[in-house]
Swiss-Prot record:
Keywords: Cell membrane, Membrane, Transmembrane, Transmembrane helix. One of its GO terms (cellular component) is plasma membrane. It holds the Pfam family DivIC. It comes from Treponema pallidum (strain Nichols). It is found in: Cell membrane. This is Uncharacterized protein TP_0181.
């Protein structure tokens, strides 16, 4: 019975510690899932921002394609003049809002910070070896004080 406990106790504690580590801090654990959910929310927000920028750029493209006033203002800013026009540079007049629109930025993906499965197994083995070591020390101390 004593040998049975010396084997079962470290083994069960090692397996339980592996289960707890993998469940909470493993690659598919609770911590990793929370990080992935937060990343998903950020990506959805980023996609919505890019969709808004896309609508703004589509409006600018439509204005530059079909609106004569916008085409004329943009052409004048580039230095073109219609035949018969006098070249006058208006003060405080820019079409700078067309130049401030960009197509968006790339968002780097970050890997979730969690333990790999191998690391969880190594920690569980360390727990098992630590329990075996404690059993050996406790048994030798008990034998020492018994005499």
């Amino acid at each position: 019975m004593r040998i049975y406990l010396r084997v079962v106790l470290p083994l069960s504690l090692a397996l339980n510690s592996y289960g707890v580590l993998a469940f909470f801090w493993g690659e598919r654990g609770v911590c990793a899932m929370r990080l992935l959910e937060r990343e998903k929310k950020e990506l959805v927000h980023h996609i919505q921002t890019l969709a808004e920028r896309g609508r703004d750029l589509a409006a600018v493209v439509d204005a530059l394609s079909f609106d004569e006033e916008t085409i004329g203002a943009y052409a004048r800013q580039l230095g073109y003049v219609r035949a018969g026009d006098v070249l006058v540079r208006p003060v405080n007049f820019t079409v700078a809002h067309m130049h401030t629109l960009d197509s968006g930025d790339a968002r780097p993906l970050v890997a979730p910070a969690c333990f790999s499965d191998t690391r969880c197994k190594v920690y569980a083995l360390c727990v098992g070896f630590f329990v075996v070591l404690l059993q050996l020390l406790w048994g030798s101390a008990r034998a020492y004080f018994k005499t």
